[in-house]
Amino acid sequence: MLDALTFDAGSTLTPDYMLMLDSRDITGNISDRLMSMTLTDSRGFEADQLDIELNDADGQVGLPVRGAVLTVYIGWKGFALVCKGKFTVDEVEHRGAPDVVTIRARSADFRGTLNSRREGSWHDTTLGAIVEAIASRNRLEASVAPSLAGIKIPHIDQSQESDAKFLTRLAERNGGEVSVKMGKLLFLKAGQGVTASGKKIPQVTITRSDGDRHHFAIADRGAYTGVTAKWLHTKDPKPQKQKVKLKRKKKEKHLRALEHPKAKPVTQKKAPKVPEAREGEYMAGEADNVFALTTVYATKAQAMRAAQAKWDKLQRGVAEFSISLATGRADIYTETPVKVSGFKRVIDEQDWTITKVTHFLNNSGFTTSLELEVRLYDVEYETEDDE
């Protein structure tokens, strides 16, 4: 159950917050005017967002300058407030009547260098080195998952592409997730329940009594049974062609709670050693209904990583679960592993990962809404070659 907050029986929890504008505490200035505060913590390059609505019935609210930096803390009175980071104001709205000012701020300033188109090429380097270089030129601190940092990148071009879009492309190709949080450029493995530095994120347990609304949806996993990726390079001048199939190594079963009752086990066979072909196709999953990646990769290794990343993403999307917590939890973040209980068996038996957190706070309440996806553990693969 949600035990992060302990309080005396019969006592009333009161929402609390602190808001700073460019290092100046302005909480007292807006406390009587605050209508609502919504804070969205998102995965990936969808920036975290802060929306503040202020009552301007008397017309005395000053409009903040775009580019101003807001630092926000939220929680409950009597408990330590949790810092949710710094946000750059990039939208200001005024509407009426009655008159209301809406301030919208984001964790990354997308009017700045991250969104500027660039030209460049990278040769004989690593994924970690590329991320660190991009972080440096955008005045951010890089934090890259160790399992991703050492991936070799023989060559890649950034052509009329913003750093944000280029990093997203790198993440999709290599099974990563990229985001900007509190001045850090994070490049981590999605859905693994670990931080960018590799530390395990403590698991949270949620019971049905903790929430007042929930939604569960499961999709037909057979919609796509596999992913293929093609490669073409010039290491071998002979025009050999090779098709490689990706198989999970036999170990603990994944998605066990979501498996179709008529599913049959697949016999694994050992992959023979063959020289890498100049041209080929790589498949993750089964061949019945395949999702084909349109990019032609430079090497077999790049094609394998791209196919594995897409296949894992499809697997994580097998089911979706969302819940609204009646008592707000400022200490919960995206990528946190979750176990639930009190729902249907298929929901309770599955491990989950938080993909989006939305905090809503006003003078009368504080709630937290969570969106979750199926959690995949650190999956290992082996290959079969079809000549």
Where are these regions (language model features)?
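Short, compositionally biased
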Residues: K86-R95, G120, Q192-V194, D351-N363
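Assembly/oligomerization scaffold segments
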Residues: M1-G112
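N-terminal export/assembly leaders
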Residues: F110-R118, I130-D157
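Conserved "cap/hinge" positions at secondary-structure junctions
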Residues: I74-W76, K189, G342
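Glycine-rich, acidic and aromatic/proline-enriched surface loops and short helix-turn segments
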Residues: R95-P98, T126-S143, A298-R305
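An acidic/polar, Gly/Ser/Thr-rich interaction patch typically located in mid-to-C-terminal regions
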Residues: R33, M37-V65, G211-E387
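Short beta-strand-centered interaction patches in the first periplasmic/extracellular domains
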Residues: L2-F7, V100-D109, P146-R221
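Polar, S/T/G-rich
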Residues: T125-S136, Q160-E172, Y224, T228-L232
